Amino acid sequence: MSATVTFSVDTAQGPRDVSVVHRRAGSGDPVLLLHGIGHHHQAWDPVFSILAAERDVIAVDLPGFGASPALPDGFAYDLAGFVPVLGALCAALDIERPHVVGNSLGGLLALEMGREKLVRTVTALSPAGFWTQAERRYAFGTLLAMHRGASLLPRPAIERMSRSAAGRTALTSTIYARPWRRSPEAVVAETLALRESTGFHETLAAGRTVQLRDAFAMDTDAVPVTVAWGTRDRLLLRRQGVRAKHTLPGARLVRLPGCGHVPMNDDPALVARVILDATA
């Protein structure tokens, strides 16, 4: 069951209320799960129960995505806007320095939370930001095409396509290496989440200036970092994982054989094991 938490975040214009939808289960060390751009917390469903058997797991809809409302006026959809909100969210949920796991945009946010020492460990699955400008333009163009396609398709067409493996492949093969494994209901829900995400365009625009290279200094002794990359990632190409390792030499780099950009669907057991090992 999902729940909504509302909390206050300080801004230059005074405190503002932010609401975040999340799913929480399990017990033990807290693990915060952050999805990618245009997705929702259900991206973590394939691994959620496995993780919740050993951890206190909180999967969130980032503001402006999934069922969470947009950020209030005056907030930017960039690192400087998102990270204080996530810090305030942790305080509202009474979790102090959780382990954080993020995919794509969520991985970028997780790394920034780690850089600011807001978390115990960081596990970043195909994190955004380790691209060249050409790779970024390719990824953003692909994301815009996905968003446009989801916006143009009537809901009955999405539901009809999702009933077949071929249709699910057409809708989601950019992010999944094994799109047929995703249930029809999940594909419908995430396609609708993509087109209805109020923060999509502002987040994408903010990402144009992000490039995590030598200037991204992070103490990986104080906050251990694991970076994992699918060998069949078609959105953020796997060579970006090698670049991440060069940028963060203290990080652990893990290959996810046969996995795409959102690896939780492609190999839930492997991804869960990587997360549990990283948060032990």
Region spans (language model):
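Alpha/beta-hydrolase fold catalytic core
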Residues: 1-31, 52-56, 95-96, 279-280
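Short beta-strand/loop motif that positions the catalytic acidic residue
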Residues: 221, 227-229
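Conserved acidic catalytic loop of the alpha/beta-hydrolase fold
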Residues: 80-98
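Acidic catalytic loop of the alpha/beta-hydrolase fold
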Residues: 232-236
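Conserved alpha/beta-hydrolase catalytic His-Asp/Glu region
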Residues: 158-220
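Flexible "cap/lid" loop of the alpha/beta hydrolase fold
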Residues: 119-155
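Catalytic histidine-centered segment of alpha/beta-hydrolase-like enzymes
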Residues: 259-272
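Conserved HGGG/HGGXW glycine-rich cap/lid loop of the alpha/beta-hydrolase fold
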Residues: 21-69
